[in-house]
Amino acid sequence: MALAGAGFDMADFLGTISDTVRPGTARPAVMHAAELEALPAGQVHNPTTLAVAGRLPTATFELFRQTIPPGQSSDMQRHYHETVHYVIAGRGHSDIEDDKEAWAAGDFIYTPPWTWHRHYNDSATEAVEFLTIENSRLLQALGITRRQSAGLCTVAEARARFPEEPAARPGLAAQPDLEDQS
């Protein structure tokens, strides 16, 4: 399975992090923290760690616990799905297109579809913990997923690496891939 580039397939990616949800399949109503499925470091293209609550019976959204180490950040990325991060612990800021937004524990961060974004941990000593909720399962079921990672760069650098394509807007012709330029 390709983790990036032209051979990347979102179905393969999601299949590595959680079971495929089937209606009527027995799944737990409660998933304990110790049962989260950690993604191997090679599947996360940035210094964050992700653990998925993949056994929950969700058909349209995915739940992750995401950790950003002190002084680190996620990669600059964009994707067709919407994402909400609930800040469990820590403080930092996010670049979402041309906006810089500060946040702290208890806040929610919304990332609209197909917007360049990167999340930063502003502490030199404390990790950031997010509960990340994204509707990627729904878009996968509809066959319209797409992700791009520009690596550890600015929004301007990401835009230069990935010029806008008219068909790359959600709701138009899908081009499933993950193009990693890290």
Protein language model annotation of sequence segments:
Residues M1-T60, Q148-S182:
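A short, N-terminal "cap"/entry segment at the start of jelly-roll beta-barrel domains
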Residues P47-T49, E62-H79, P113:
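Conserved short histidine dyad/triad with adjacent acidic residue
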Residues G54-T58, S74-H81, K100-E101, T115, ...:
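Short, low-complexity cationic-aromatic patches
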Residues T60-L63, V84-Y86, Y110, T125-I144:
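A short hydrophobic beta-strand segment most commonly corresponding to one strand
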Residues R65-P69, R78-I96, I133-S136:
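Short, conserved beta-strand element in jelly-roll/cupin
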Residues S74-M76, S94-D95, T111, H117-A124, ...:
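Short beta-strand His + acidic residue motifs that chelate non-heme Fe in jelly-roll/DSBH
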Residues D98-W114:
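Short acidic-glycine-tyrosine-enriched beta hairpin
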